[in-house]
Amino acid sequence: MSRIGKKPIPVPEKVAVTLDGLLVTVKGPKGELTRTLPEGVTIDQTDGLIIVSADSEKRKSRERHGLSRTLVANMIEGVNNGYSKQLEIVGVGSRAQVKGKTLVVSAGYSHPVEVIPPEGITFKVENNTNVLVSGIDKELVGNEAAKIRAIRPPEPYKGKGIKYLGERILRKAGKSGKK
């Protein structure tokens, strides 16, 4: 049995959860999320708690037990508080700005790179070098932040590029001169 999967999920008062077989719909103050859970799990709702259980002791069911519980918990947290990731742009002349909803990143290429957000994701830029990606879907926020970081990943010699706020870059020594 999954150690994470057997924990019940508390549902805050501001959040409404609707179960229809494996289809879970969560509504809260920040929005609404719907997801179909994988086969092999059962989900029940009793007095403010959601309990996810594995259908059988088969390996596939046990694998999906903890995953399903975490997915539902992330949906509840997302519609209640939301998620955000911060990125930092390091380097001379590298900056970002928001035009409408689109994020425009100047990262040392011959052209600026435009990132169009999917539905439910917003970009904010503080002092041209800090980008905040926020939304209610944890998976979508993480994917968009990873796409922005992939525009110019931090390089190991000077640390220039786009990195997550607080991310430590392993630095390498440069070439040593001929002796």
UniProtKB/Swiss-Prot annotation:
One of its GO terms (biological process) is cytoplasmic translation. Keywords: Ribonucleoprotein, Ribosomal protein, RNA-binding, rRNA-binding. One of its GO terms (cellular component) is cytosolic large ribosomal subunit. It holds the Pfam family Ribosomal_L6. Disulfide bonds: none annotated. It comes from the Bacteria. The keyword Nucleotide-binding does not apply. GO terms for molecular function: rRNA binding; structural constituent of ribosome. Belongs to the universal ribosomal protein uL6 family. PANTHER family: 60S/50S RIBOSOMAL PROTEIN L6/L9 (PTHR11655), LARGE RIBOSOMAL SUBUNIT PROTEIN UL6M (PTHR11655:SF14). Part of the 50S ribosomal subunit. This protein binds to the 23S rRNA, and is important in its secondary structure. It is located near the subunit interface in the base of the L7/L12 stalk, and near the tRNA binding site of the peptidyltransferase center. This is Large ribosomal subunit protein uL6. The lineage of its organism: Bacteria, Bacillati, Cyanobacteriota, Cyanophyceae, Synechococcales. The gene is rplF.
